C-alpha cells in the first residue's frame, strides 16, 4: 500500500541523503593532508627533537606554497620544486622534498597513492657547497684498535647510560662492507637472504628513504661478514637497533661514542688521527682497490660511480707509505 510522505518526513529524508552524500565523498588528498597523516603515523618512531625542528619547518613551508603545488601530479611536483627554489636555500628545498618523498612512499604503502612524484626531483636541486669531508682512511691495524675499544668498553664513562659494546657490531659491519652509515642503520633482517645483502634504503635525520643513487644493490656476504651477522641478536627487525630499540641516531652516535673513543686512541698513539665514522667507508674502498679489485666492481659494491671512486676515494696514506725501489 502506497503512503504519502508528510512534508516533515520528506524534509528529514532529504537532509539525511545530503548528509550521507557528504560523508561518502572522499576527502581531497594532497601533499599537505598526506603530510599530516604521515606525522601521526610516525610520531612514536621519530625523535621529539626532529619533530620540533624539521617537522615544524616542513609545516611552515607547505603552508606557505600555493595549493596547486601540493597536488599529486608530475607537473605539481615540478612546480613545487620551482617555488621552493625561488624562496628557500637549496638545503631547505632538499629537506622539504625528502620529507615529501617519505610521506609519498608511506602513502603508497597505505594504498593512498600509486606512485612517488618526488623521487626524481633531487637531480634538479643545485649542489650546495662542499662539506669539507675528508677522504682519508684508517689503516687495518687502526680499525682493529677501534673495534677492540668498542668491544671492551675500555673508555666508557661512568655517566654513560649504555655500554660502548652495544655498537661494536655496527662499527665492525661498516668496516667490513664500506656501507654508508645511514644504509647500515636502515638494514633489516629481511634484507639478508641467500648469501647477499639487499641495499635499498637509508635512514637519516628521522627519514627512511632510498639510497643516494635511488637504486638498490646486492652485496655479497663473505665468511667474515657471515660470522658477524650470525653472532648478532635477532630480537627485532632492525639488524642494528639503538639501545632503546629504534633507529640509531648517527649524529648522537658520532658525538657520544665514536668521537670520544677514537680521540682517546689518538691520544694513546694507537690511531694516527681522528677521522669521522664515514671514513670507514673510504677505508674499505681504498683497501679493496689496494687488494687489486677492479674499480668497476668496487664502485658497484659501494653503490657509486667508477669516476667518483677515482676522484675521491683512492686515498694514499703517505704516513705509512713505503716507496718501491727500482
List the predicted regions and their residue ranges.
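Catalytic-site neighborhood detector that most strongly recognizes the C-terminal catalytic loop/helix
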Residues: 44, 137, 203-205, 302-326
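Basic/aromatic-enriched alpha-helical hairpins
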Residues: 15-88, 103-105, 263-264
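DNA major-groove recognition helix of helix-turn-helix
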Residues: 97, 188, 289, 302, ...
Amino acid at each position: 500500500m502506497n503512503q504519502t510522505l508528510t512534508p516533515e518526513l520528506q524534509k528529514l529524508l532529504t537532509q539525511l541523503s545530503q548528509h550521507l552524500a557528504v560523508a561518502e565523498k572522499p576527502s581531497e588528498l594532497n601533499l599537505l593532508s598526506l603530510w599530516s597523516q604521515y606525522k601521526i603515523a610516525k610520531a612514536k618512531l621519530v625523535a621529539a627533537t626532529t619533530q620540533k625542528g624539521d617537522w615544524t619547518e616542513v609545516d611552515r613551508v607547505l603552508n606557505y606554497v600555493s595549493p596547486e603545488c601540493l597536488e599529486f601530479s608530475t607537473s605539481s611536483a615540478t612546480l613545487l620544486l620551482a617555488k621552493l627554489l625561488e624562496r628557500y636555500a637549496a638545503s631547505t628545498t632538499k629537506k622539504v622534498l625528502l620529507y615529501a618523498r617519505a610521506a609519498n612512499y608511506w602513502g603508497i604503502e597505505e594504498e593512498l597513492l600509486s606512485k612517488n612524484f618526488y623521487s626524481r626531483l633531487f637531480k634538479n636541486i643545485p649542489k650546495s657547497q662542499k662539506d669539507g669531508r675528508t677522504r682519508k682512511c684508517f689503516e687495518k691495524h687502526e680499525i682493529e684498535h677501534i673495534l677492540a675499544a668498542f668491544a671492551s668498553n675500555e673508555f666508557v664513562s661512568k655517566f654513560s647510560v649504555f655500554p660502548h659494546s652495544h655498537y661494536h657490531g655496527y662499527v665492525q659491519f661498516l668496516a667490513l662492507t664500506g656501507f654508508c652509515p645511514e644504509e647500515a642503520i636502515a638494514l633489516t633482517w629481511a634484507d639478508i637472504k641467500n648469501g647477499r645483502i639487499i641495499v635499498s634504503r637509508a635512514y637519516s635525520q628521522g627519514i627512511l628513504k632510498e639510497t643516494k643513487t635511488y637504486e638498490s644493490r646486492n652485496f655479497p656476504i663473505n665468511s667474515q661478514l657471515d660470522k658477524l651477522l650470525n653472532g648478532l641478536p635477532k630480537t627485532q627487525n632492525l639488524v642494528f637497533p639503538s639501545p632503546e630499540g629504534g633507529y640509531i641516531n648517527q649524529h648522537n652516535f658520532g658525538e657520544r661514542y665514536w668521537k670520544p673513543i677514537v680521540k682517546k686512541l689518538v691520544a694513546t698513539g694507537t690511531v694516527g688521527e681522528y677521522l669521522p665514522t664515514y671514513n670507514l667507508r673510504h677505508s674499505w674502498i681504498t683497501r679493496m682497490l689496494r687488494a687489486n679489485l677492479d674499480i668497476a666492481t668496487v664502485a658497484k659494491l659501494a653503490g657509486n660511480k667508477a669516476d667518483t671512486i677515482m676522484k675521491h676515494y683512492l686515498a694514499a696514506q703517505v704516513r705509512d707509505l713505503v716507496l718501491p725501489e727500482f
